[in-house]
Protein backbone atom coordinates (compact mmCIF):
# COMPACT_ATOMS: atom_id res chain seq x y z
CA UNK A 1 0.00 0.00 0.00
CA UNK A 2 1.22 3.48 -0.86
CA UNK A 3 1.24 5.92 2.04
CA UNK A 4 -0.43 9.21 1.09
CA UNK A 5 -0.69 12.63 2.73
CA UNK A 6 -3.43 15.01 1.48
CA UNK A 7 -2.86 18.76 1.87
CA UNK A 8 -5.71 21.13 0.98
CA UNK A 9 -7.31 23.99 2.89
CA UNK A 10 -10.81 22.96 1.73
CA UNK A 11 -12.27 20.08 3.74
CA UNK A 12 -14.65 19.03 0.96
CA UNK A 13 -11.78 18.83 -1.53
CA UNK A 14 -9.74 16.75 0.92
CA UNK A 15 -12.65 14.39 1.52
CA UNK A 16 -13.32 13.95 -2.20
CA UNK A 17 -9.68 13.23 -2.96
CA UNK A 18 -9.36 10.79 -0.05
CA UNK A 19 -12.50 8.98 -1.21
CA UNK A 20 -11.20 8.58 -4.77
CA UNK A 21 -7.77 7.48 -3.59
CA UNK A 22 -9.20 4.87 -1.22
CA UNK A 23 -11.40 3.50 -4.02
CA UNK A 24 -8.25 2.43 -5.86
CA UNK A 25 -7.43 0.07 -2.95
CA UNK A 26 -3.77 0.90 -3.53
CA UNK A 27 -3.23 3.62 -0.96
CA UNK A 28 -3.43 4.24 2.76
CA UNK A 29 -4.31 7.80 3.80
CA UNK A 30 -1.90 8.37 6.68
CA UNK A 31 -2.63 12.05 7.25
CA UNK A 32 -4.15 15.29 6.07
CA UNK A 33 -3.47 18.99 6.61
CA UNK A 34 -4.99 22.33 5.67
CA UNK A 35 -1.94 24.61 5.99
CA UNK A 36 1.83 24.63 5.46
CA UNK A 37 2.69 24.42 9.17
CA UNK A 38 0.51 21.37 9.84
CA UNK A 39 1.61 19.74 6.59
CA UNK A 40 5.29 19.93 7.56
CA UNK A 41 4.54 18.42 10.96
CA UNK A 42 2.55 15.60 9.35
CA UNK A 43 5.39 14.98 6.89
CA UNK A 44 7.91 14.46 9.67
CA UNK A 45 5.65 12.17 11.66
CA UNK A 46 4.18 10.00 8.91
CA UNK A 47 6.85 9.94 6.14
CA UNK A 48 4.44 9.40 3.19
CA UNK A 49 5.30 8.01 -0.23
CA UNK A 50 3.18 10.62 -2.03
CA UNK A 51 1.92 14.07 -1.06
CA UNK A 52 -1.18 15.33 -2.88
CA UNK A 53 -0.76 19.07 -2.53
CA UNK A 54 -3.03 22.02 -3.26
CA UNK A 55 -1.35 25.26 -4.36
CA UNK A 56 -3.41 27.89 -2.56
CA UNK A 57 -3.36 27.16 1.19
CA UNK A 58 -4.66 29.19 4.10
CA UNK A 59 -1.25 30.35 5.36
CA UNK A 60 0.88 30.23 2.19
CA UNK A 61 1.08 28.11 -0.95
CA UNK A 62 2.03 24.56 -1.78
CA UNK A 63 5.27 25.57 -3.45
CA UNK A 64 6.75 26.41 -0.05
CA UNK A 65 6.28 22.78 0.97
CA UNK A 66 7.51 21.53 -2.41
CA UNK A 67 10.73 23.54 -2.18
CA UNK A 68 11.43 22.11 1.28
CA UNK A 69 10.75 18.55 0.11
CA UNK A 70 13.00 19.02 -2.90
CA UNK A 71 15.98 19.51 -0.56
CA UNK A 72 15.35 16.32 1.42
CA UNK A 73 17.51 13.25 0.89
CA UNK A 74 14.62 10.88 0.14
CA UNK A 75 11.61 13.11 -0.46
CA UNK A 76 8.09 11.84 -1.08
CA UNK A 77 6.65 12.29 -4.54
CA UNK A 78 4.68 15.51 -5.04
CA UNK A 79 1.38 15.58 -6.90
CA UNK A 80 -0.17 19.02 -7.21
CA UNK A 81 -3.97 18.75 -6.98
CA UNK A 82 -5.44 22.15 -7.70
CA UNK A 83 -8.10 24.19 -9.47
CA UNK A 84 -5.45 26.36 -11.17
CA UNK A 85 -3.90 25.30 -14.46
CA UNK A 86 -1.43 28.20 -14.80
CA UNK A 87 1.12 26.76 -12.35
CA UNK A 88 1.91 23.54 -14.23
CA UNK A 89 5.32 24.67 -15.48
CA UNK A 90 6.32 25.92 -12.04
CA UNK A 91 5.18 22.61 -10.56
CA UNK A 92 7.51 20.55 -12.71
CA UNK A 93 10.37 22.92 -11.91
CA UNK A 94 10.16 21.58 -8.34
CA UNK A 95 10.21 17.99 -9.67
CA UNK A 96 6.52 17.27 -9.18
CA UNK A 97 5.45 13.78 -10.19
CA UNK A 98 2.15 14.99 -11.62
CA UNK A 99 -0.31 17.89 -11.83
CA UNK A 100 -4.03 17.14 -11.65
CA UNK A 101 -6.93 19.56 -11.82
CA UNK A 102 -10.15 19.87 -9.85
CA UNK A 103 -12.77 18.51 -10.09
CA UNK A 104 -10.90 15.25 -9.60
CA UNK A 105 -11.35 12.33 -11.95
CA UNK A 106 -10.88 8.79 -10.64
CA UNK A 107 -9.25 7.52 -13.84
CA UNK A 108 -6.79 10.42 -13.77
CA UNK A 109 -5.83 9.56 -10.19
CA UNK A 110 -5.26 5.92 -11.17
CA UNK A 111 -2.91 7.13 -13.92
CA UNK A 112 -0.97 9.17 -11.37
CA UNK A 113 -0.51 6.14 -9.10
CA UNK A 114 0.67 4.07 -12.07
CA UNK A 115 3.13 6.80 -12.93
CA UNK A 116 4.49 6.74 -9.38
CA UNK A 117 4.95 2.96 -9.37
CA UNK A 118 6.67 3.06 -12.74
CA UNK A 119 9.05 5.75 -11.50
CA UNK A 120 9.88 3.77 -8.35
CA UNK A 121 10.52 0.62 -10.36
CA UNK A 122 12.89 2.54 -12.60
CA UNK A 123 14.77 3.83 -9.55
CA UNK A 124 15.09 0.30 -8.13
CA UNK A 125 16.47 -1.01 -11.42
CA UNK A 126 18.99 1.82 -11.54
CA UNK A 127 20.15 1.03 -8.00
CA UNK A 128 20.67 -2.60 -8.95
CA UNK A 129 22.76 -1.57 -11.94
CA UNK A 130 25.17 0.51 -9.84
CA UNK A 131 25.17 -1.74 -6.76
CA UNK A 132 28.55 -3.20 -7.63
CA UNK A 133 30.21 0.20 -7.57
CA UNK A 134 28.16 1.81 -4.80
CA UNK A 135 30.28 2.85 -1.82
CA UNK A 136 28.80 4.03 1.48
CA UNK A 137 30.90 6.34 3.63
CA UNK A 138 30.08 6.64 7.31
CA UNK A 139 29.97 10.33 8.18
CA UNK A 140 30.68 11.65 11.67
CA UNK A 141 30.36 15.32 10.79
CA UNK A 142 27.45 17.53 9.80
CA UNK A 143 28.00 20.12 7.08
CA UNK A 144 26.26 23.36 8.07
CA UNK A 145 25.84 26.27 5.65
CA UNK A 146 26.75 29.30 7.78
CA UNK A 147 26.57 32.74 6.16
CA UNK A 148 28.94 32.43 3.17
CA UNK A 149 30.79 29.29 4.29
CA UNK A 150 30.19 25.70 5.37
CA UNK A 151 31.16 24.55 8.86
CA UNK A 152 31.77 20.88 9.69
CA UNK A 153 30.42 20.00 13.13
CA UNK A 154 30.99 16.74 15.02
CA UNK A 155 27.56 15.12 15.14
CA UNK A 156 28.10 13.64 18.60
CA UNK A 157 28.78 17.15 19.98
CA UNK A 158 25.39 18.50 18.86
CA UNK A 159 23.07 19.02 21.83
CA UNK A 160 20.00 20.12 19.91
CA UNK A 161 18.76 21.74 16.73
CA UNK A 162 15.96 24.26 17.11
CA UNK A 163 14.15 27.36 16.01
CA UNK A 164 15.43 30.11 18.33
CA UNK A 165 14.26 33.70 17.84
CA UNK A 166 13.02 32.73 14.39
CA UNK A 167 16.39 31.32 13.27
CA UNK A 168 17.42 27.69 12.81
CA UNK A 169 20.09 27.14 15.46
CA UNK A 170 22.49 24.25 16.05
CA UNK A 171 23.72 24.09 19.67
CA UNK A 172 26.86 22.10 20.44
CA UNK A 173 28.70 21.61 23.72
CA UNK A 174 30.82 24.71 23.04
CA UNK A 175 29.36 26.66 20.12
CA UNK A 176 26.07 27.94 18.75
CA UNK A 177 25.56 28.13 14.98
CA UNK A 178 22.81 29.80 12.96
CA UNK A 179 22.36 27.91 9.71
CA UNK A 180 20.55 28.38 6.40
CA UNK A 181 19.29 24.77 6.54
CA UNK A 182 15.70 24.14 7.61
CA UNK A 183 14.72 21.85 10.48
CA UNK A 184 13.29 19.41 7.94
CA UNK A 185 16.62 19.20 6.11
CA UNK A 186 18.63 18.83 9.32
CA UNK A 187 16.34 16.09 10.59
CA UNK A 188 17.08 14.13 7.42
CA UNK A 189 20.82 14.66 7.82
CA UNK A 190 21.05 13.64 11.49
CA UNK A 191 21.16 9.95 12.50
CA UNK A 192 17.78 8.81 13.85
CA UNK A 193 19.45 6.50 16.35
CA UNK A 194 20.63 9.54 18.36
CA UNK A 195 18.34 12.40 17.35
CA UNK A 196 14.58 12.73 17.59
CA UNK A 197 12.10 15.53 17.16
CA UNK A 198 10.66 16.46 20.55
CA UNK A 199 8.79 19.60 19.53
CA UNK A 200 7.61 21.26 16.34
CA UNK A 201 10.66 23.54 16.65
CA UNK A 202 13.27 21.28 18.29
CA UNK A 203 15.29 18.13 17.59
CA UNK A 204 17.25 16.77 20.57
CA UNK A 205 20.28 14.51 20.89
CA UNK A 206 19.01 11.88 23.32
CA UNK A 207 22.58 11.09 24.39
CA UNK A 208 22.83 14.58 25.92
CA UNK A 209 19.68 14.36 28.06
CA UNK A 210 20.44 14.34 31.80
CA UNK A 211 17.00 15.11 33.24
CA UNK A 212 13.35 15.27 32.19
CA UNK A 213 11.26 17.83 34.07
CA UNK A 214 7.43 17.78 33.91
CA UNK A 215 6.13 21.18 32.82
CA UNK A 216 2.42 21.81 32.28
CA UNK A 217 -0.44 20.28 30.31
CA UNK A 218 1.54 17.01 29.77
CA UNK A 219 4.59 18.80 28.36
CA UNK A 220 8.18 18.52 29.57
CA UNK A 221 11.56 20.23 29.59
CA UNK A 222 14.74 18.32 28.80
CA UNK A 223 17.83 19.34 30.78
CA UNK A 224 20.87 18.78 28.60
CA UNK A 225 24.47 18.07 29.63
CA UNK A 226 25.70 21.61 29.00
CA UNK A 227 22.79 23.11 30.92
CA UNK A 228 20.33 24.18 28.23
CA UNK A 229 16.60 23.37 28.30
CA UNK A 230 14.74 21.84 25.37
CA UNK A 231 10.91 21.78 25.36
CA UNK A 232 8.95 18.60 24.67
CA UNK A 233 5.43 19.09 23.32
CA UNK A 234 2.51 16.78 24.03
CA UNK A 235 2.65 15.56 20.44
CA UNK A 236 6.09 14.04 20.92
CA UNK A 237 6.12 13.29 24.68
CA UNK A 238 4.65 9.80 24.33
CA UNK A 239 7.19 8.78 21.70
CA UNK A 240 10.06 10.14 23.80
CA UNK A 241 8.93 8.27 26.92
CA UNK A 242 8.55 5.10 24.90
CA UNK A 243 12.07 5.48 23.52
CA UNK A 244 13.54 6.11 26.97
CA UNK A 245 11.32 3.41 28.54
CA UNK A 246 9.78 5.68 31.15
UniProtKB/Swiss-Prot annotation:
Phosphorylated by LytS. This is Sensory transduction protein LytT. Residues 3-117 form the Response regulatory domain. CDD domains: REC_LytTR_AlgR-like. Its main location: cytoplasm. The lineage of its organism: Bacteria, Bacillati, Bacillota, Bacilli, Bacillales. Keywords: Cytoplasm, DNA-binding, Phosphoprotein, Transcription, Transcription regulation, Two-component regulatory system. Transmembrane segments: none annotated. InterPro entries: CheY-like_superfamily, LytR-like, LytTR_DNA-bd_dom, Sig_transdc_resp-reg_receiver. One of its GO terms (cellular component) is protein-DNA complex. Residues 142-246 form the HTH LytTR-type domain. One of its GO terms (biological process) is regulation of DNA-templated transcription. It comes from Bacillus cereus (strain ATCC 14579 / DSM 31 / CCUG 7414 / JCM 2152 / NBRC 15305 / NCIMB 9373 / NCTC 2599 / NRRL B-3711). Disulfide bonds: none annotated.
